[in-house]
């Protein structure tokens, strides 16, 4: 999941450059729209990238701790596994929230009305 989200972040940054080239036409307002679109897409890429890194660190820490605990006391493997899976789900939720924020920034940006009147 983390690799998929990191790939998505790279694609968002690539799409920002393509959108800027497509939207840039002679005229002042089109440049403002292009800069706004590029800023939103770069922000979305950064959000998903940081969210994926945070999730990766959280999942790695949870798995490391669980492996050490099972190595020390193999009798409680079931309880440790359940706790580890809950912790991994919470860590992965950060990446999912970052994905939602990036999709909102790209497709349903609430700040568009402040920059474009008319």
From Swiss-Prot:
The record marks 92 as: Reversibly protonated during proton transport. NCBIfam families: ATP_synt_c (TIGR01260). GO terms for cellular component: plasma membrane; proton-transporting ATP synthase complex; proton-transporting two-sector ATPase complex, proton-transporting domain. Pfam families: ATP-synt_C. This is ATP synthase subunit c. F-type ATPases have 2 components, F(1) - the catalytic core - and F(0) - the membrane proton channel. F(1) has five subunits: alpha(3), beta(3), gamma(1), delta(1), epsilon(1). F(0) has three main subunits: a(1), b(2) and c(10-14). The alpha and beta chains form an alternating ring which encloses part of the gamma chain. F(1) is attached to F(0) by a central stalk formed by the gamma and epsilon chains, while a peripheral stalk is formed by the delta and b chains. It is a multi-pass membrane protein. HAMAP family: ATP_synth_c_bact (MF_01396). GO terms for molecular function: lipid binding; proton-transporting ATP synthase activity, rotational mechanism. It comes from Syntrophus aciditrophicus (strain SB). CDD domains: ATP-synt_Fo_c. It comes from the Bacteria. InterPro entries: ATP_synth_csu_bac/chlpt, ATP_synth_F0_csu, ATP_synth_F0_csu_DDCD_BS, ATP_synth_F0_csu_sf, ATPase_proteolipid_c-like_dom, F/V-ATP_Csub_sf. F(1)F(0) ATP synthase produces ATP from ADP in the presence of a proton or sodium gradient. F-type ATPases consist of two structural domains, F(1) containing the extramembraneous catalytic core and F(0) containing the membrane proton channel, linked together by a central stalk and a peripheral stalk. During catalysis, ATP synthesis in the catalytic domain of F(1) is coupled via a rotary mechanism of the central stalk subunits to proton translocation. Key component of the F(0) channel; it plays a direct role in translocation across the membrane. A homomeric c-ring of between 10-14 subunits forms the central stalk rotor element with the F(1) delta and epsilon subunits. Keywords: ATP synthesis, Cell inner membrane, Cell membrane, CF(0), Hydrogen ion transport, Ion transport, Lipid-binding, Membrane, Transmembrane, Transmembrane helix, Transport.
């Amino acid at each position: 999941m983390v690799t998929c989200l990191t790939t998505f972040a790279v694609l968002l940054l690539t799409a920002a450059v393509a959108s800027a080239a497509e939207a840039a036409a002679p005229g002042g307002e089109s440049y403002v729209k292009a800069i706004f679109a590029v800023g939103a897409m770069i922000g979305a890429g950064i959000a998903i990238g940081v969210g994926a890194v945070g999730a990766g660190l959280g999942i790695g820490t949870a798995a490391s701790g669980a492996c050490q605990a099972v190595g020390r006391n193999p009798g409680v493997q079931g309880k440790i596994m359940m706790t580890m899976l809950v912790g991994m789900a919470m860590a992965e939720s950060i990446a999912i929230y970052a994905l939602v924020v990036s999709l909102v920034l790209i497709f349903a940006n609430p700040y568009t009305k402040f920059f474009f009147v008319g």
